[in-house]
Design a protein with these regions (language model features):
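Short beta-strand-centered segment that lines the nucleotide-binding/catalytic pocket of NTP-utilizing
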Residues: 1-9
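Flexible active-site lid/hinge loop adjacent to a nucleotide/diphosphate
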Residues: 6, 17-101, 113-114, 119, ...
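Acidic-glycine-rich active-site phosphate/pyrophosphate-binding loop
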Residues: 112-130, 172-180
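Active-site-proximal loop->helix
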Residues: 12-16
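Short glycine/serine/threonine-rich phosphate/pyrophosphate-binding segments
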Residues: 8-10, 27, 195-199
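Beta-strand->loop->alpha-helix junctions that form or flank phosphate-binding loops
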Residues: 3, 95-114, 163-167, 177
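Nucleotide phosphate-binding/pyrophosphate-handling subdomain across enzymes
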Residues: 131-205
Length: 205
């Protein structure tokens, strides 16, 4: 099941969801604010100022984001961006395993983007997973998103099957969505980019 902050409420599916089912949720800071439980596997891709019209200050926003892992058990998994100062600090109070990803650093363990290629690092050994020219998504931020997805599903999905899906995935509506090509110019709908950080990532793509 897929839901959360992407317009699909799962409350309507509660009678269908079984204990063994897997649920993928995108959770915003104001959904996380009052949460007393955390998903078994969580990810924080970045922490930058956002939703400050809802939160009393930036620190409250940061604290809300951290609720996605604060109540995990020691069997939990937290995936975080090693390139963002605030997300990198989250590994210090994580209770379970931490998987890092980076597009700027070399990692002994985790996932990196190097020269347009997503690689898995294991004890310093780098394994080619998928490259920019093999996928339909544009931008280094989408390669970082692929790192996140691979880390989240590492213990659940065969990597080769995951890569097959990644190669065919064309993205979601309103996020660098190709509308049409006219007179050699590609027109994109990126109306989901509601913060400077997202807008800059889209423009760099």
């Amino acid at each position: 099941y897929l839901g959360g902050n992407i317009g699909i409420p799962l409350f309507t599916k509660l009678n269908e969801i079984k204990p063994e089912d897997l649920i993928v949720l995108e959770l915003s800071s104001f959904q996380l604010m009052g949460m007393k439980v955390s998903p078994d596997i969580s990810a924080i891709t970045n922490i930058t100022p956002n939703h400050l019209n809802v939160h009393k200050d930036y620190q409250e926003y940061i604290n809300a984001k951290k609720n996605i892992y604060r109540n995990q058990k020691d069997t939990g998994i937290l995936v975080i961006n090693a390139d963002n100062d605030l997300t990198r600090e989250c590994q210090n109070d994580a209770k379970g395993d931490v998987i890092l990803f980076s597009s700027k650093q070399k990692l002994d363990y985790g996932f990196i983007v190097e020269n347009g290629i997503v690689k898995e690092c294991n004890d310093g050994i780098r394994k080619h997973i998928v490259s920019q020219d093999e996928i339909k998504l544009k931008g280094i931020h989408n390669l970082e998103n692929i790192c996140t997805a691979l880390a989240l599903t590492k213990k659940l999905v065969n990597t080769e099957k995951a890569v097959d899906t990644i190669k065919e995935f064309a993205g979601v509506h309103h996020r660098l969505e190709l509308v049409r090509t006219l007179n050699g110019v590609e027109w994109y709908n990126d109306s989901a980019s509601t913060t400077p950080t997202r807008g800059i990532s889209a423009l760099k793509s």
